[in-house]
């Protein structure tokens, strides 16, 4: 292999591509690795941002603007059934937090995600219990035992939480409230893209490489490791581990040559 680097020429028997993906271009991310793969005839799968915050349509974002900085426990489900139980964070651009970052890797443009904002509570049963013990307690104060005050105030302004006591809350209103808080369907406008994405989905097709050495099956001496490959993990260090593990496998193979 011959490389031209700033006017210098370097020759090597083996070439290892560890250039990463497209995430966080401000740190120097480029499509260099994908271009090398394509130059040698390897298949590169379509790329997109992963582990990335959602942006929201303007109308919904305006409704939720007072919630920026509010974090809640949640479960979030993609249309393919993938579910994560993590914290969700409202931001000035849309939705973030571990729950959203995780589900973003399973979301496709145009799809909805479904959010349960009270995953640790049987909300219908909780309201019934509170009504039996404190019938004159306001619905707002009852929900404040489970949700942040700012979220309750926002939902009140949007007409999602009636300004009533528990004994005044009728069954239709209660069911609508429970559905709003446990089955909130959101259609993201998109994501924040590679600028803030922690990983890149897609990349060099793993079928093109040896799973033992990371060497291209049909191009001897050419190796790909880390995020440039079509391998994406969850939050929690899995992507770091993949980078280290694939590098170790490649290094072992090179040492044995």
Task: Name each model feature, range by range.
Residues 9-26, 37-38, 88-93, 222-224, ...:
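Short hydrophobic core segments
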Residues 42-48, 52-172:
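An anion/pyrophosphate-binding glycine-rich loop and adjacent beta-alpha core
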Residues 14-60:
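Glycine-rich loop(s) and the adjacent beta-strand/alpha-helix scaffold that form part
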Residues 153-232:
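A glycine-rich dinucleotide-binding beta-alpha-beta segment and adjacent secondary-structure elements
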Residues 23-24, 53, 91, 95-98, ...:
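Glycine-rich phosphate/pyrophosphate-binding beta-alpha loops
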Residues 22-40, 231-257:
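A conserved FAD-binding loop/helix module that cradles the flavin
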Residues 1-10, 15, 72, 78:
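Conserved beta-strand-loop-beta-strand element in the redox core of flavoprotein oxidoreductases
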Residues 22-25, 97, 107, 212-213:
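Glycine-rich nucleotide phosphate-binding loop and flanking beta-alpha elements
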């Amino acid at each position: 292999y011959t490389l031209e680097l700033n006017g210098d020429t370097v020759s090597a028997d083996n070439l290892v591509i560890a250039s990463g993906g497209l995430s966080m271009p401000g740190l120097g991310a480029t499509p260099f690795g994908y271009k090398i793969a394509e130059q040698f005839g390897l298949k590169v799968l379509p790329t997109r941002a992963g582990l990335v915050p959602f942006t929201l349509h303007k109308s919904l974002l305006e409704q939720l603007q007072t919630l920026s900085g509010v974090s809640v426990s949640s479960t979030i489900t993609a249309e393919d059934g993938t579910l994560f139980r993590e914290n969700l964070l409202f931001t000035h651009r849309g939705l973030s937090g571990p729950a959203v970052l995780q589900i973003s890797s399973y979301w496709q443009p145009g799809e909805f995600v479904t959010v349960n904002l009270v995953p640790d509570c049987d909300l219908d049963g909780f309201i019934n219990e509170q009504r039996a013990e404190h019938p004159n307690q306001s619905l707002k104060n009852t929900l404040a035992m489970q949700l942040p005050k700012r979220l309750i105030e926002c939902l009140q302004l949007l007409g999602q939480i009636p300004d009533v006591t528990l004994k005044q809350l009728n069954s239709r209103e209660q069911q609508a409230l429970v559905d709003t808080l446990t089955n909130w369907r959101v259609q993201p406008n998109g994501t924040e893209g590679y600028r803030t994405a922690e990983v890149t989905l897609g990349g060099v097709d793993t079928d093109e490489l040896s799973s033992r050495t990371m060497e291209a099956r049909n191009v001897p001496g050419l190796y790909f490791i880390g995020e440039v490959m079509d391998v994406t993990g969850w939050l929690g260090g899995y992507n770091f581990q993949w980078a280290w593990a694939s590098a170790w496998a490649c290094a072992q193979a090179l040492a044995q040559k």
